[in-house]
Amino acid sequence: LPSDLSPYSAIVIFGGPMSVNDDEQFIKDEISWMKQVIESNIPFLGICLGAQILAKYLGCDVVKNKNDLAEIGFYEIEPVGEGGNIFKNQNIFYQFHTEGFEIPPNCQLLARGDAFKNQAFKFQNCYALQFHPEVNFLVHLRWLFLVLKKKPTILFLKGSQNLFYQLYLRFKYNKAISLWLDSFLDNYLLAQK
């Protein structure tokens, strides 16, 4: 992890197959690194695991759904507060997780959902998204291929969408999500500099 953040316009931590609760040194290092990121005042975007790392750093738990649900597929989020402006043109996003975060104190909830109540929040100039707006059609296919190869029953988890329905929704929402991400980066994340 870089110790000098001055060359960066923004910092993004993406998702991954690991859990923020795993006892791996690199996860602990990323959680600790958040102190430097926040103090640098550089805009930050946490996506899925990245959002959970921010929440964990801010003192909140990241836990499995109490009804043992997963979100693997496309799900609607409900904008809250400032999220009404952020998500006014797009509120269905691709998700791939079995854990969710609590909203830390002094943070602003931006969106909530059904299975995982907290979907997005803001802390100072940091945005945390539980979902994956960065995943396009090819990345989506690659993820499904790699995950199904390792865990062939993952799409049978309660709450998950089947492969064909996910692909149908990918075709339906791919362009709108891509446009939303471009707008979000320009009008919210990078506008904070």
Language-model features and meaning:
Residues 27-31, 61-63, 111-112, 145-147:
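Glycine-rich, phosphate-binding/catalytic loops in enzymes
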Residues 16-17, 51, 98, 133:
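Active-site metal-binding loops of divalent metal-dependent hydrolases
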Residues 56-93:
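A conserved active-site-flanking secondary-structure segment within enzyme catalytic domains
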Residues 37-61:
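Catalytic nucleophile loop
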Residues 78-193:
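Amide-donor transfer/coupling interface in amidating biosynthetic enzymes
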Residues 1-45:
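Flexible gly/pro-rich beta->alpha loop and the following alpha-helix that scaffold active-site loops
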